[in-house]
């Protein structure tokens, strides 16, 4: 189906709508369309300062672009530089969000912790992701807590006991919220053999 041309539109609603579409396509395994929509979302974000109401776009664009970049890095794909650039732009938007409102802080910390994990910077990844968990708890943001526990669990392949605890917590919180997507992700991670992140210098 044809989708709306957002090229002349302005405002947070545009970036948010594009980010939602990008995530939907990623979940449907249409990575090419997910990337195209995410890049459009980044353009929409760049039209002005990051505002509070842009938090869905900031969060979802990171959630789409970071795994695409990680897969490209693992597969030595030709478009890895493009995906890296897009993912880091999304993370910078998340950081801007975290600088202007508290709810952006766990989003930013989780994004940059994931970047560090992708680059093989384990200590930095663990610190940022642990801070994301703490901030989500402090702000009473259970959905962010579940996602931060998932991200930290992914970053702890060499600590199976703590990894399992975090993933079980993510599953419990997600189930309580009725969020089957994150509950299923936690279950999948609990049943797979953890692997170390791709080593790469920044």
Please identify what each model-predicted range represents:
Residues 1-201:
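Helix-coil-helix junctions within alpha-helical repeat/solenoid scaffolds
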């Amino acid at each position: 189906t044809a989708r709306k041309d957002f090229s002349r539109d302005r405002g947070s609603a545009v970036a948010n709508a594009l980010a939602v579409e990008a995530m939907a396509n990623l979940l449907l395994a249409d990575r090419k369309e997910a990337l195209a929509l995410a890049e459009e979302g980044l353009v929409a974000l760049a039209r002005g300062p990051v505002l509070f109401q842009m938090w869905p776009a900031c969060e979802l664009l990171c959630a789409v672009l970071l795994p695409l970049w990680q897969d490209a890095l693992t597969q030595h794909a030709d478009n890895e530089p493009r995906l890296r650039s897009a993912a880091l732009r999304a993370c910078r938007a998340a950081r801007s969000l975290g600088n202007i409102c508290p709810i952006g802080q766990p989003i930013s910390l989780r994004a940059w912790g994931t970047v560090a994990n992708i680059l093989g910077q384990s200590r930095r990844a663990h610190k940022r992701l642990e801070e994301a968990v703490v901030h989500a708890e402090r702000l009473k943001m259970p959905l962010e807590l579940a996602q931060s526990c998932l991200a930290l669990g992914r970053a702890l392949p060499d600590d199976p006991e703590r990894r399992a605890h975090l993933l079980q917590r993510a599953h419990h919180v997600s189930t309580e919220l009725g969020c089957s997507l994150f509950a299923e992700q936690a279950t999948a991670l609990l049943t797979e053999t953890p692997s170390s992140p791709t080593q790469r210098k920044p």
